[in-house]
Amino acid sequence: MIRLGAPQSLVLLTLLIAAVLRCQGQDAQEAGSCLQNGQRYKDKDVWKPSSCRICVCDTGNVLCDDIICEDPDCLNPEIPFGECCPICPADLATASGKLGPKGQKGEPGDIRDIIGPRGPPGPQGPAGEQGPRGDRGDKGEKGAPGPRGRDGEPGTPGNPGPAGPPGPPGPPGLSAGNFAAQMAGGYDEKAGGAQMGVMQGPMGPMGPRGPPGPAGAPGPQGFQGNPGEPGEPGVSGPMGPRGPPGPAGKPGDDGEAGKPGKSGERGLPGPQGARGFPGTPGLPGVKGHRGYPGLDGAKGEAGAPGVKGESGSPGENGSPGPMGPRGLPGERGRTGPAGAAGARGNDGQPGPAGPPGPVGPAGGPGFPGAPGAKGEAGPTGARGPEGAQGSRGEPGNPGSPGPAGASGNPGTDGIPGAKGSAGAPGIAGAPGFPGPRGPPGPQGATGPLGPKGQAGEPGIAGFKGDQGPKGETGPAGPQGAPGPAGEEGKRGARGEPGGAGPIGPPGERGAPGNRGFPGQDGLAGPKGAPGERGPSGLTGPKGANGDPGRPGEPGLPGARGLTGRPGDAGPQGKVGPSGAPGEDGRPGPPGPQGARGQPGVMGFPGPKGANGEPGKAGEKGLAGAPGLRGLPGKDGETGAAGPPGPSGPAGERGEQGAPGPSGFQGLPGPPGPPGEGGKQGDQGIPGEAGAPGLVGPRGERGFPGERGSPGAQGLQGPRGLPGTPGTDGPKGAAGPDGPPGAQGPPGLQGMPGERGAAGIAGPKGDRGDVGEKGPEGAPGKDGGRGLTGPIGPPGPAGANGEKGEVGPPGPSGSTGARGAPGERGETGPPGPAGFAGPPGADGQPGAKGDQGEAGQKGDAGAPGPQGPSGAPGPQGPTGVTGPKGARGAQGPPGATGFPGAAGRVGPPGANGNPGPAGPPGPAGKDGPKGVRGDSGPPGRAGDPGLQGPAGAPGEKGEPGDDGPSGLDGPPGPQGLAGQRGIVGLPGQRGERGFPGLPGPSGEPGKQGAPGASGDRGPPGPVGPPGLTGPAGEPGREGSPGADGPPGRDGAAGVKGDRGETGALGAPGAPGPPGSPGPAGPTGKQGDRGEAGAQGPMGPSGPAGARGIAGPQGPRGDKGESGEQGERGLKGHRGFTGLQGLPGPPGPSGDQGASGPAGPSGPRGPPGPVGPSGKDGSNGIPGPIGPPGPRGRSGETGPVGPPGSPGPPGPPGPPGPGIDMSAFAGLGQREKGPDPMQYMRADEADSTLRQHDVEVDATLKSLNNQIESIRSPDGSRKNPARTCQDLKLCHPEWKSGDYWIDPNQGCTLDAMKVFCNMETGETCVYPNPATVPRKNWWSSKSKEKKHIWFGETMNGGFHFSYGDGNLAPNTANVQMTFLRLLSTEGSQNITYHCKNSIAYLDEAAGNLKKALLIQGSNDVEMRAEGNSRFTYTALKDGCTKHTGKWGKTVIEYRSQKTSRLPIIDIAPMDIGGAEQEFGVDIGPVCFL
């Protein structure tokens, strides 16, 4: 583009115009001329087709460019008429005075448009055809003077013009001069004076430029262009009409046995069955009408204050867990072809801020900062809740009398006084006459729902309904991730051109194409850069010598140079993003024992241990030292208002106030008297039966019906042909550990252990009594053959054999097995904490501790039975008048009035005193999971719970360290001696076997040593409330309550007999074992025990050197036992023998010293109530207690004497009018209670009414929240648990998308599903929902086998489900819960095929090539076989190879919800170049 400042633009134009003038004399048709818009221009001609565009003819090429203006440096620039660039108005100012010297040539004026200033551009019209060339126009009028240009360089000397007559002096003009007139001095087309030999005169002024001529004729037709590249294949057209039937095939082989026939007709109903178990409790009934508010209950007795718990010490913060290991590197990508080096682009705009990086590890603690400046006082806090009323203060001293006040103004009229108390009841009048019969009462309320009727007989099965019409095509699923590039497909047939799509984004720059044929002349392009200087024209006649010119401007830029050598290598690029993680490798061999990991996350709390023995009460601790003085507390909240001060003097009367805001809506008026009930209407005559209605339109296809009852057992089919062996399945996950097997026989004797350290020499035992002579044993039988020893180590390698001949080349091998496991990985991070193990068995009892000190005073005994009430005493004398009592508490509220309309929510009231505990409400649903709080300080240990039922046997623990030797058991019978095998070398490790069948329960293992105490885990989430447990035992003794007020002295009771000793109470539950006490002092040597039974045979010592065999002597009698020899060396440690039977109990040892007092045991259950004790002596009266709570109003006392009449009150304000018609009937009563008394009795205090409105609003809001929890609405904020729940709560809602949260808790992991409200099914969408249609698998092997799409095919994937926005594992967790909450699941998938069999092979007439599908628990479902693992085909369009796309719809239903959803599919009939497939995955639905 040419970029010109307003003033500089003239310089370039002057040059260009000069070039024009040089060539004006040449022939118009000479070579190198240009044709544009029907007008021919000579080589090097310059012209402006529009005010902001300039063109030059360069050896036959038209080069045009836009003039780019620079902004002038002034406030209000203006664009002169016909110009392109704005200039400052100062440049337009006229200069007065004489005509100045002639300026340099200016830019040619543009006189094309004299209409007005430039308008805004209009919308682009369609391009018109080129018009025919117009005639040359007349010369245009003189253009408006252009702005003054800068001094141009001297032009090339022009041809001398004819001499003009001298002109008269001109008028004063613009300072720029009339450059149009100056330009007229050049030659135009008709000026040829130099060639005619006319004498040259001075150059005349240049004439104005003529208007443009009419448009030229259209250019010649261009050559035919190359054919375009073939278009993209069009979208598949709709399926064509069904072709004509083919010729009849050969008769097929005998088919396989047919499927079982339809169910037979329904049998007669069976006999009445035995009564069933009680049904599960019914659903809660419909919410009843809101009851009227009940009367206020009596105030409950104050509960005993609970013992204050000890505050636990706060736990230490756990150390941060180790950072997870880095993921495995993905496979290395294939190297792409090197791209051509691109030119450096312009710097882009700075990109948007990237997402925040991952949170870095926490930095080390910084140094403590200097104390900041004192902050400004904060804003006054909101008023805190009103504190509980303080205890009444001591009465103050009377104040000194104040000065007499000035007499006040008369006060305003008081409010009318409250109605006086009711007078004494009058004497009963005589009975009245019976009244007239009353009008019928209003309609009674509907009775409660009747009990549920018994279930009816099952109905006869209905007939199968028609198949519904095909549903509408579902919405397109979300676009899947781009698959891997497929192999190049065959060239498709030429598609019809599609409609024009929207303009796509610009593609990358393609490689240059071959040179095309020349096209038609296009529209004028944007102005090009000035071309190179053309070749010199023919030499003209020599002109006269001109004035020497100034040195010329630098020439136009030269041609582009050759491409330079490649630059140096650029700087290292940024590290690319991590590749996608590679497929999981097979598990490597187990790594070496890693270093001990950091302590794992705290496990879940183990089950509650058995109750320990009750400890003794500990001593009371000493009082702690006083703590340091605390920092001054924060300013307290504003205290409650003080008591009202004495009345001030009355102020002057204020001005009339503005009207107050409208009050709350008043309470509803008293109900009117009931209207008379209408008479009972007569029964209407039954109408005639209507004519049958027209047949309705065909309904939409119904949703799949519920699963029908199973059909009758079909006949046994003939045995099917043996199936082809399936491919090896993937290695199964390790099965769960079976229960421990029965105790195996003792193993072979182990290798000798290292020699143990010498034990402490035991005291020498007493010599045992001589044992009786045993009977002679029979010689033992030959032992059975010993077990085969393990295989020996491999022998040494043999010598190399001779080299064999070269064999023939083998067939192409199948895909190799997976490679060897990679090198051992680094030690993994510590695994998550396991669940807590079962509680260890009780430890050995510790030595008995010392006698503890006396315990604290025991609990008070249960109160004795109530004695009979004494007779009332005689009336005492009247006491002295007491001091005036404190102001009584507010009386009890009257009966609740009818509820008024809800007022606006008032400000929150002060906190009321807590009411008595209500009965426990039904358990609410779990609320949304709160944000995890900080760990609280550990609570105090709870009281031990009741003994739980025995837990399931735990897994066998590692054997603990050996316990102390048990007492020797009696010897077992002599076993048969086996031949001792040699100890074999260990065999090579076998492959992992399949899990065995569960063995019988093993005997319990040895007692393990108690494990180290784990760190305290964070509190688990609050579980759902458990069932109400049995009543707990009484708590510990409470701290003594404040002294109550002294009771009235009772009459002294008669002294009772002494009661009998009560029955012994049930023993308390054993407490937890105390920690072992310190060892007591050694007791005195006990008496010698009786000889113990003979112990079992000790392990054999090491074999001695073999002696020479002596001759066999006769069997001698058993000799007497010899003297005890010296202690031999310790033999090798034998294997632990079988557990001996427990020995007889030894004699009790001496009483050990008392151990220290154990912790206090749980309180035992209360014993039976003992008989009353004797009356104690009267106690000293206690101190006067604080005044008790205000008692209930007493009964109305007897009527007092009438008081003296009071002074008359001021007249009250006029009352509102009342419509007495409502009460007209009330005045006509003769007797009976005042009917208005109920209206008056419940007039609420105005303050109470204000309070009630706020309470009502709060209750209403709470009620709404609770209602939304009890009856969720399926929104994201308030998701349901399943669609079945939604259907139960809102049966009228329509099917559609809703949110569910099966695992409850926090709603952030809720997922959107489709709820079928007709059936209650919950349907989860797959993500993605389609497998693109293409050739996924190529194989040259003739052997066909099933190939799993997600596991084996390149680019395949396992199907996943749920919202793609959720964290990866969230949907799996939610699906697990959804499966648990459901009893049946179903899913459809559609297999799109091209030359691939999906279900039935029509040619072979069997299902051998049918797909396999894999459920989420890795079970494979097939087309035939066990009916529990077979799927059905709803539609089968893939039965033969046709070269066209077809589809088969497969459905799988099961009541084993763990098998759904489908996660993989394995076709068999694939692998050829023409064989393609794709899959549409339907949603999985659970009910």
UniProtKB/Swiss-Prot annotation:
It comes from the Eukaryota. Induction: Induced by mechanical load in chondocytes. Residues 1-25 form the signal peptide. One of its GO terms (biological process) is embryonic skeletal joint morphogenesis. Glycans are attached at K190, K287, K299, K308, K374, K608, K620. Residues 157-172, 208-217, 433-442, 1069-1079, 1199-1216 have a biased composition (Pro residues). Residues 26-181 form a propeptide. The modification 3-hydroxyproline is found at P670, P907, P1144, P1186, P1201, P1207, P1213. Residues 1253-1487 form the Fibrillar collagen NC1 domain. One of its GO terms (molecular function) is identical protein binding. Residues 360-369 have a biased composition (Gly residues). Disulfide bonds join C1283-C1315, C1323-C1485, C1393-C1438. Residues 1215-1241 are annotated as: Nonhelical region (C-terminal). InterPro entries: Collagen, Collagen_superfamily, Fib_collagen_C, VWF_dom. Pfam families: COLFI, Collagen, VWC. The record marks A181, Q182, A1241, D1242 as: Cleavage. Contains mostly 4-hydroxyproline. Prolines at the third position of the tripeptide repeating unit (G-X-P) are 4-hydroxylated in some or all of the chains. Belongs to the fibrillar collagen family. This is Collagen alpha-1(II) chain. It comes from Mus musculus (Mouse).
